[in-house]
């Protein structure tokens, strides 16, 4: 009886651990070469956020200017972010063909942020190429997102 109880307890501990999702390192989702191919501008290797196990990564150029930023959040945050952005007067533009749902937020005429919902994650992606229009920024964000999404 004790042996059976111990076996069941061990199974209860081990089974959820086997199904637990391994946290993704966002800095492994893109390479400097992938970014350079989209931006026509070289970048340094990605740098994780300051917190240990950060869900953020930033790629900058040799001058220290940030060029690409990604953050991974739980998928459940997607609708909360969207509602908060809309509540604060942000312009949300739906995007088709990416993930389960996606939208751009454009705070001004030359910048943008892309939010993409997958089954398990919210991907936030911003791209700041040198001397680019908002349309070029959004095209770059979509291009990089299509390279990231198969890894999520």
Give the label of every model feature segment.
Residues 21-23, 93-152:
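A short, solvent-exposed beta-edge/loop patch
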Residues 37-109:
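Short, solvent-exposed recognition patches
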Residues 1-6, 23:
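Short, basic/polar N-terminal leader/transit segment immediately after the initiator methionine
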Residues 1, 34, 77-81, 136:
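Exposed alpha-helical structural elements
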Residues 19-54, 58, 91, 136-152:
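N-terminal "mature-domain start" segment
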Residues 4-18:
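Sec-dependent N-terminal signal peptides
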